Regions:
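Catalytic histidine-centered segment of alpha/beta-hydrolase-like enzymes
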Residues: 269-280
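The serine-hydrolase catalytic nucleophile loop
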Residues: 83-96
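Short alpha-helix in the alpha/beta-hydrolase fold that links the catalytic acid
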Residues: 232, 246-254
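Alpha/beta-hydrolase active-site loop
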Residues: 120-141
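Conserved alpha/beta-hydrolase
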Residues: 97-116
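An N-terminal hydrophobic leader/cap segment in hydrolases
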Residues: 1-52, 62, 323-333, 354
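Hydrolase active-site cap/lid region
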Residues: 160-216, 225
Length: 379
């Protein structure tokens, strides 16, 4: 094999991995924080579980709830993270949900964090995993109404799933993409202005490789087609300056969304930025409005305590770093800065690859890919 051909093959490998095998957020487990802690003088516990995904992969997950329940049934929000992220991301929502007496469920989706699985599917397989999570929560004593809060891939996953299940009562969709093929074209043109025929050829080859490895036609992933059938109240969130998923994706979904809806745009930050306090407050009020109702009867007594757990909670809030203003984010900012450096390097590599691809490269690669697919189909 010639040096040029090896370079092109390496280039395509980087491109398809960027979509279904982004850098894994292999976080230190102590970043989950203490399993018992206090927030606003109230004791909480984190209970860890292993769920089995639709494809048979282990998914580490956690439920965060108060030690002494204010009611027999408490609402819970399932947080669905982004594509190169993990359940760690969901901890950012605790200060939004806990003051409203809403529990939080976080999970490492397959191919992410400490879960099993080699690839992600940007919402296709993950949407089936949401059903497994909902079934699990329904079978836990004390589960009230269930909501979904998803970001990026997680937002599109939530949109794909929600209309299938009446048990989901409310949605927060932060930075969803409407159609993956459109998103891929936009990202390609953003980094380098290639002719349409080259972009089409690149996407065709990458799509074929992804289908061979993951079994899905990634460029037919179209979350927006589920929006019209959705019926749950939803709050959409998007950064105006999001360079990864343009604001028009959220606007397009919002315009045809079938349920009660509102759109909150952030003028601060971009795709992965922390949302302004005014928006997180609105999200908290939104979930309280739609998840706290007569199904969650308030009944404060000893029977509502999780007596089977011996709690040695953190008395000094500084030790809990999840809630201490700045402490948690100091750890995460350092961690995120390293991730952002890697992501920038990946995008720079991709840009160089795209600049060196020509029509002959696409033709050769497409012929070889079709040949491999035919051989596999015969097997």
């Amino acid at each position: 094999m010639e040096k040029g051909e090896t370079k092109i093959k390496l280039g395509y490998e980087i491109l398809w991995k960027f979509i279904i095998r982004p850098p894994r957020d292999d976080y230190p487990l102590n970043y989950l924080g203490p399993s018992q802690f206090k927030y606003n003088s109230k004791a909480y516990i984190r209970r860890d579980f292993i769920l089995i995904s639709h494809q048979g992969y282990k998914m580490p997950s956690s439920l965060i709830e108060p030690l002494s329940r204010p009611c027999k049934k408490m609402p819970v929000v399932i947080y669905l993270h982004g594509n190169a992220s993990s359940r760690l991301e969901g901890l950012n929502t605790l200060s939004t949900l806990l003051p409203h007496n809403i529990n939080l469920f976080i999970v490492d989706l397959p191919g992410c964090g400490h879960s099993e699985g080699d690839y992600i599917s940007l919402g296709y397989y993950e949407s089936y995993d949401v059903g497994i999570i909902v079934d699990f929560l329904e079978n836990l004593p004390g589960t009230g109404n269930i909501g979904i809060w998803g970001r990026s891939m997680g937002a599109s996953t939530g949109l794909i799933y929600a209309h299938r299940d009446k048990r989901i009562k409310a949605l927060c969709l932060d930075s969803p993409f409407a159609n993956f093929c459109r998103l891929a074209r936009e990202l390609t043109k953003q980094y380098i202005n290639l002719p349409d025929f080259i972009i089409n050829g690149i996407l065709k080859i990458i799509g074929g490789t992804i289908k061979e490895k993951n079994g899905i036609d990634i460029f037919r992933l179209n979350p927006i087609e589920e929006a019209e059938n959705a019926f749950q109240p939803a709050i959409f969130v998007h950064a105006i300056n999001d360079k990864l998923i343009n604001l028009h994706h959220a606007i397009d979904i919002f315009n045809i969304y079938g349920g009660e809806k509102s759109l909150k745009c952030s003028e601060i930050g971009g795709h992965n930025s922390k949302r302004p306090k005014r928006i997180t407050q609105e999200i908290g009020n939104f979930f309280e409005k739609y998840l706290q109702n007569n199904n969650n009867e308030f009944d404060i007594n000893e029977d509502n305590k999780l007596n089977e757990y011996k709690i040695n909670y953190v008395n000094d809030l500084n030790q809990s770093f999840v809630f201490k203003s700045g402490e948690y984010y100091k750890n995460r900012e350092l961690y995120n800065s390293l991730k952002e450096e890697n992501e920038k390097k990946n995008m720079d590599d991709i840009k160089k690859i795209l600049l060196n691809i020509n029509e002959n490269d696409i033709s050769k690669e497409s012929t070889e890919l079709n040949s491999n697919i035919s051989i596999n189909e015969k097997k």
